[in-house]
Curated annotation (Swiss-Prot):
This is Nuclear pore complex protein Nup85. It is found in: Nucleus, Nuclear pore complex; Chromosome, Centromere, Kinetochore; Cytoplasm, Cytoskeleton, Spindle; Cytoplasm. Keywords: Acetylation, Centromere, Chromosome, Cytoplasm, Cytoskeleton, Kinetochore, Membrane, mRNA transport, Nuclear pore complex, Nucleus, Protein transport, Translocation, Transport. Its main location: nucleus. Transmembrane segments: none annotated. The keyword Acetylation applies. One of its GO terms (biological process) is macrophage chemotaxis. GO terms for cellular component: actin cytoskeleton; ciliary basal body; cytoplasm; cytosol; kinetochore; nuclear envelope; nuclear membrane; nuclear pore. The keyword Nucleus applies. The modification N6-acetyllysine is found at K92. The modification N-acetylmethionine is found at M1. Essential component of the nuclear pore complex (NPC) that seems to be required for NPC assembly and maintenance. As part of the NPC Nup107-160 subcomplex plays a role in RNA export and in tethering NUP96/Nup98 and NUP153 to the nucleus. The Nup107-160 complex seems to be required for spindle assembly during mitosis. NUP85 is required for membrane clustering of CCL2-activated CCR2. Seems to be involved in CCR2-mediated chemotaxis of monocytes and may link activated CCR2 to the phosphatidyl-inositol 3-kinase-Rac-lammellipodium protrusion cascade. Involved in nephrogenesis.
Length: 656
């Protein structure tokens, strides 16, 4: 099934006049930058823009609410657990697990709503109080919708139990009766309380007939003149047939008993049993499902879906799921009476009663301020195998699209982005690509955060992102002159070019200071030094210094010579290497052989003559520098002396 988008709602931004000015904007993962340009709509430029501000527009502001963040965190664990439900489970065991998951989601919504309610009460600022109260209303509506979807789509309650579930639904969400009961029963004489009959009526409207009978007993004790009528009505309440969860009677048996009970109620009305007490007579009419009597209690019913459930309770207690939408539509029409139009919540509930899952999701997406509700509800319904046929026209399915939108919103927050990773993981078609795009945009403010991001990328073999993050961290370290950290990140990124750059900085630092920093890192490069020639040279040059320090002069000399003759050393560093050879040339014992000395001489002359082998300008710089010229002369002298000593020594060895 394909579904095309409709025109989105227009959002007006205060201070921005798009009719006069051309706008400039740039999208981010969860935000948009917007500003007016200096051009008007005719294309003419003005020197000064009328609104020289840049606006940051956020599409998911709810992620910044402290309380709603608890909702996001708690539901994340439920979501991940749901994805791990074994596909092999079937029948009652699978259904029971899905119902349990749904109840867990609802409990999280309710806990969040109750906390928000307490904050709204405690708010000192009226504007904040109104904002929190608005959020309470939204959360209450979310729980109301979710609970109904649970009954109709997940429980899939059949005729009989369906009404019991709907009664529980109404009792849970129309809860003013509890505070009213506490108020009435808290007095010395409840039957004389001004709201006594309102309480009795509401109890009957909600099918709480045992409690209503108890209230009538109090009225009978306080008013003996109507005791007989109260007793008769109480007996009718007691004998009303209701299909209880543990009852084994069939629907046919229930319908026969209910029909008999209804005839008895009608007989009492026809006999004017309650004529002397209009309130009791009204209650009897309600129990007969009299629509006029029910509509007289509009104020106590408070909404059309309460009216619907009460109407079904007393007129068709064995209503079949397929007939629900007829009763729902007529109840809505009767309750509103043409005086007002349905609210968005009414449309959502009506779509649910029509068993139109996709319309429920669509209406919720429009009405609610974030993607949390529709993403999690759709995912749960998809696990119930109710959405397999619904694909969107751009290639993704509805579940994945909504999860991607929700996860994208989480990535706009400085800490909730970690939750978003798991949502992307469970989107098989576009999740990986979306995660790659979003994770590259996370600001790496601290090294701890960078390590978290890096670990996530490495666990998912996101090679390019790992390289990118490591390179960013390496560049930050270089800017802060933390060369050891920079080298570690470039090695981790396997970035040869950047490793070369950092190695050059190490060598330059050595030339300026005469010693290496971060010796532990350089000493333990291991196979990582093969990443680039310059890094190999850095590691080997440090090894030369270590050998020299250990007085292993022969090994040090061989390594130094190999660094020069293998062309691995940068030409700009040759003079430093030759200078390092001076102490070895001046040793009492001959370290360099005649052949090795010839090689050193050749390297020195190559450097002094300025052969442009590597295109570097160092030879020309040496010729112009008196100090370097002095070094060259000293090296020539030392090499000549060492050559003479080496020839004599080698000749003596041959003669012997």
């Amino acid at each position: 099934m394909e579904e095309l988008d409709c025109e989105p709602a227009v959002t007006w931004i205060p201070g921005v006049n798009s009719k006069k000015k051309q706008m400039c904007f740039d999208w981010g993962p969860g935000e948009m930058l917007l500003c007016e340009t200096s051009f008007n709509q005719t294309g003419k430029s003005e020197k000064v823009p009328s609104c020289p501000f840049i606006y940051i527009i956020r599409k998911d502001v709810d992620v910044y609410s402290q309380i709603l963040r608890k909702l996001f965190n708690e539901s994340h664990g439920i979501f991940v657990g749901l994805q791990k439900i074994e596909e092999e489970l079937s029948g009652k065991s699978r259904k029971a697990q899905l119902v349990r998951v749904s109840k867990n989601y609802r409990s999280v919504i309710r806990a969040c709503m109750e906390e928000m309610h307490q904050v709204a009460i405690a708010a000192k600022d009226p504007a904040s109080g109104r904002q929190f109260s608005s959020q309470v209303s939204i959360l209450s509506a979310m729980e109301l919708i979710w609970n109904l979807c649970e009954i109709l789509f997940i429980e899939v309650a059949p005729a009989g139990p369906l009404l019991l579930h709907l009664l529980d639904w109404v009792r849970l969400h129309v809860c003013e009766v509890d505070s009213l009961s506490a108020d009435v029963l808290g007095g010395d004489n409840p039957s004389k309380h001004e709201n006594f009959w309102d309480l009795v009526t509401v109890l009957v409207l909600q099918g709480r007939l045992d409690e209503a009978r108890q209230m009538l007993a109090k009225e009978a004790d306080a008013n003996p003149s109507c005791a007989g009528m109260c007793r008769v009505l109480g007996d009718l309440m007691r004998t009303m047939p209701i299909l209880s969860p543990g009852n084994t009677q069939t629907l046919t048996e229930l319908e026969l008993k209910w029909q008999h009970w209804r005839e008895e109620c009608e007989r009492h009305l026809q006999d004017n049993t309650f004529a002397a007490n209009p309130r009791l007579e009204s209650l009897c009419k309600i129990m007969l499902g009299d629509e006029a009597a029910l509509l007289e209690q509009k104020e106590l019913l408070s909404n059309w879906y309460h009216f619907l459930v009460t109407r079904l309770l007393y007129s068709n207690p064995t209503v079949k799921p397929i007939d629900l939408h007829f009763y729902a539509q007529s109840s809505l029409d009767m309750f509103l009476g043409g005086e007002s139009s349905p609210e968005p919540l009414d449309n959502i509930l009506m779509a649910a009663f029509e068993f139109d899952i996709h319309q429920v999701i669509k209406e919720c997406s429009i009405a609610l301020s974030n993607w949390w509700f529709v993403a999690h509800l759709t995912d749960l319904l998809d696990h119930c195998r109710l959405l397999q046929s619904h694909n969107l026209y751009f290639g993704s399915n509805m579940r994945e699209f909504l999860l991607l939108e929700y996860a994208s919103g989480l990535f706009a927050h400085h800490s909730l982005w970690q939750l978003g990773v798991d949502y992307f993981d469970y989107c098989p078609e576009l999740g990986r690509v979306s995660l790659e795009l979003h994770i590259e945009r996370i600001p790496l403010n601290t090294e701890q955060k960078a390590l978290k991001v890096l670990r996530i990328c490495e666990q998912r073999q996101m090679t390019e992102q790992v390289k990118s993050i490591c390179k960013i961290l390496a560049m930050k370290a270089v800017r802060n002159n933390r060369l050891g950290s920079a080298l570690s990140w470039s090695i981790r990124a396997k970035d040869a070019a950047f490793a070369t750059l950092v190695s050059d900085r190490f060598l330059r630092d050595y030339c300026e200071r005469g010693c290496f920093s971060d010796l532990d890192l350089i000493d333990n490069l291991g196979s990582a030094m093969m990443l680039s020639d310059r890094l190999t040279f850095l590691g080997k040059y440090r090894e030369f210094h270590r050998l020299y320090g250990e007085k292993r002069f022969g090994d040090a000399a061989s390594l130094l010579l190999s660094l020069m003759t293998s062309q691995i050393a940068p030409r700009s560093f040759w003079m430093t290497l030759l200078t390092d050879a001076l102490p070895l040339l001046e040793q009492k014992q001959v370290i360099f052989s005649a052949e090795q000395t010839y090689e050193l001489m050749r390297c020195l002359e190559d450097l002094a003559s300025g052969r442009p082998e590597c295109g570097e300008p160092d030879a020309q710089r040496l010729q112009d520098d008196d100090i370097e010229t002095t070094k060259v002369e000293m090296l020539r002298l030392a090499l000549a002396r060492n050559l003479a000593r080496a020839i004599i020594r080698e000749g003596s060895l041959e003669g012997s």
